[in-house]
Design a protein with these regions (language model features):
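Binuclear metal-dependent phosphoesterase catalytic core
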Residues: 2-3, 12, 145-153, 251-259, ...
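N-terminal active-site segment of His-dependent metallophosphoesterases
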Residues: 1-82, 87
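Divalent metal-coordination and catalytic microenvironments
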Residues: 29, 49, 61, 66, ...
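Active-site-proximal beta-strand elements of phosphoester/diester hydrolases
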Residues: 21-34, 156-166, 206, 283-289
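Extended active-site neighborhood of metal-dependent phosphoesterases/phosphodiesterases
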Residues: 2-16, 82-199, 292, 305-311
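His/acidic metal-ligating clusters that form di-metal
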Residues: 56-60, 158-161, 173-270
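Active-site environment of divalent metal-dependent phosphoester hydrolases
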Residues: 33-36, 69-72, 101-113, 167-170, ...
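Metal-dependent catalytic neighborhoods of phosphoester/phosphodiester hydrolases
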Residues: 37-41, 65-90, 107-128, 217, ...
Length: 329
């Protein structure tokens, strides 16, 4: 394994071994229900997580939201989201890998037993989980930075974990929320503090709900425009759906382009999309999902199921590779 976690100047960092890529495995949309009705699907999802982690040979696992699915009204999960969260965390802890999460829109639905603050306390108490609740004065729970350092102590890449929030009001029908202005300012301040000699620090961002510019870039790519570059994966949601916020204008992507720090964004949310492409200098990637529960009939589909590998090199460059569950032994 490459990379060791340390505390330096009061914050957690990862120190990368020279000459070896630091590998992150992105998992997303596990959707553990935790109810009697979802027992078999939960078993399949947790077995898939275990198989993918064992095959990935990753130094760190980043889970980009919707670990659980407390949807009792649809008989797709118990409102006791602590139970389902424990089911997922116990598998990760048993594997002994360093891991972390950001929240999706489903982890703490309005009828769920625990809110994000309480779930955050649980995650941060796990031995191998590196989740941080972040500054309580900033919107959301789980806005935090883990710097990836080179052996000489210089910054390689800032790993930025962001709560992309859930809904505009208390329920799904109000539409998806955006990353808020104060979260964007927090990101900028973190990067400014990590930057040296006028060179903007490189960063990768991990969050759940995609920005609208992901679809904008895909449409340009689909039309053969040189403004966007296709790398791998597919858009398989019905009618080429991208689940970005439709009723509120998000500023995150545009501000990241201006900042010049963020080289990659890794998301989930749309379970059938696995697209990875570059638009306006930022690699936009839908992680392969796990879900056997939330989408009707998804247990019988498999082309979208798996993990996503991110290999970061000494100079801060990185590669992205899809790891389908079907390729895992």
């Amino acid at each position: 394994m490459n990379g060791r976690f340390e505390k330096r100047d009061g914050r957690e960092v990862i120190v990368k071994e020279k000459g070896k890529p630091f590998r992150i495995l992105q998992l997303t949309d596990i959707h553990i229900g935790g109810s009697l009705g979802t027992r078999k699907k939960d078993e399949l999802a947790l077995a898939a997580v275990e198989k993918i982690v064992k095959n990935a040979n990753a130094d760190f696992v980043a889970v980009t939201g919707d670990m659980v699915y407390p949807m009792p009204l649809l008989n797709q999960g118990t409102r006791n989201n602590l139970k389902s969260t424990k089911m997922f965390a116990s598998v990760m802890e048993k594997l002994g890998v360093d891991w972390t999460v950001v929240f999706g829109n489903h982890d703490s639905e309005v009828w769920a037993k625990l809110n994000k603050e309480q779930l955050g306390d649980f995650y941060s108490a796990q031995q191998h989980c590196h989740f941080q609740k972040g500054d309580p004065d900033i919107f959301g729970v789980g806005n935090y930075c883990i710097p990836l350092l080179n052996e000489d102590g210089s910054l390689n890449t800032a790993l930025m974990f962001i709560d992309s929030n859930a809904y505009l009001t208390w329920n799904f029908f109000s539409g998806f929320d955006v990353i808020h202005d104060d979260q964007i300012e927090w990101y900028k301040k973190e990067i400014k503090a990590l930057s040296n000699d006028g060179e903007v620090a490189k960063s990768l961002a991990f969050f759940h709900i995609p920005p609208k510019e992901f679809k904008e870039g895909w449409e340009k790519c689909y039309r053969g425009s040189s403004e966007a570059t296709y790398h791998c994966g597919f858009v398989q949601e019905k009618d080429n759906y991208f689940g970005y916020p439709k009723t509120k204008e998000g500023k995150f992507f545009g501000e990241m382009v201006k900042l010049g720090s963020c080289k990659g964004m890794f998301m989930g949310h749309d379970h059938l999309n696995t697209l990875s492409m570059t638009y306006k200098g930022i690699r936009l990637t839908y992680g392969m999902s796990i879900d056997y529960n939330a989408y009707k009939g998804i247990a019988k589909r498999n082309t979208q199921r798996g993990g996503t590998l991110i290999d970061i090199y000494d100079d801060g460059s990185f590669d992205v590779t899809l790891l389908p569950l079907s390729d895992c032994k």
